[in-house]
Amino acid sequence: MTIAVDRAARNSHSGFLEAGISLIAKRGIDNITVADISKASGFTRATFYSYFGDLDGLYAEIWMLYGRLWLEALAKDDLPYKSEADQLRCSAVLEIFIASKRKPAVLEVVTPTVSNWWNDSVSENKADQARLAWIVAGNIGIAISKHLAPSITNVKEIIALLRQMPSDPAVLEAMGLAPTPKTAPLQAVLRSLEVPEQTDEERIKTSTIEVVASAGVADASMTRIARNLQVTTGSVYPRFKNVSEIIGEAFNWGQKTIVEENTAAYATTNSNPDSYAAIIVGANSESRKVWRDFRLEMYLASRVRESLSKAMIPGLVEADTLLATFARKNRLPERHIDQIVGLMHALGLGFPALQNAGVDVQAIEHRIPTRYLVSVMNILKSSGVAASEFDHRIAARSVVPVIGNGDRSTTSAAS
């Protein structure tokens, strides 16, 4: 009798986990209920509550089972997408990871997992830290945005180049990639979207961004947006028909504004590879936290909301155009422009997700991978070698340093 009861308990527990994973992956983490999971699993809600307490308890347990494995797979470019069950599991863990920033009971298990994984995976070597952060951030960005831009998977070719980035300080020095100890990383000073001279419509869009950033798309409403502005709902409705319209317009406006400011900030620095590193550090500063969280929420929700995906496309197309123009001005190889733009988008999603989980993204020595990639791009451009055929061990023998003595640009993105 005891054996039968134990077996039934195991079956019901695993049944809830399997049903939860499937529903999170297919509907999105904000669009399921305990009743949905109970129905899909065939077990009662009372039994669910006895195991997990609430939905966040289920999410936490799924993360504890698969979170570390998922992070390790991201680092190896080896996400197990071979079976439908694997695909559902990866999608569910991704949703839990992104949404955990606003779910304290989930974040309290996500953060230690990420911390232990990070500490076990890196040494004091700055290049090793940067390589791991860029590869994992890039793969997170690809995973959360491929439904909007399937071609972003082409960024994996650039990630493969990053995997070849050397760690040996002597090799880095010979390639002109090692920042001198006396030079601290730059941080671009980037504004938040909220500035004093905003129009009424821009203030409403800013309020929308703040609400979605803190609560998610599913919990955003016209009432909440108005309340955040300290105005009545009637002040919002004349300008926007419904909450879906305002969320889409807020994304497109914010995306264009942020990209324009980032590219302008690049121009005010030395306009060399270190300048992009400075933008990464600035983009992950406190002034941009609301925008970062909003953007993550938009990608998360649009994965299962086709109407939201369609609303976001104009802003993404315009951002891609601006970034591609920026890349061409810096004379990066034409055949890799789309991949470079994709990498910028992917890192813009992956780094904030890692930072929310406790990785100090601003402390990463981003100058090493930015110098390395620009150096590699120059080699590919001059040699005609495909990125897939690149070997840094051969290239290192003849490479012109990206940064010269005193960290002055000798071969930059604009050369």
Residue ranges of predicted features:
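Basic, helix-initiating cap at the start of DNA-binding domains
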Residues: 1-27, 34-40, 57, 178-215, ...
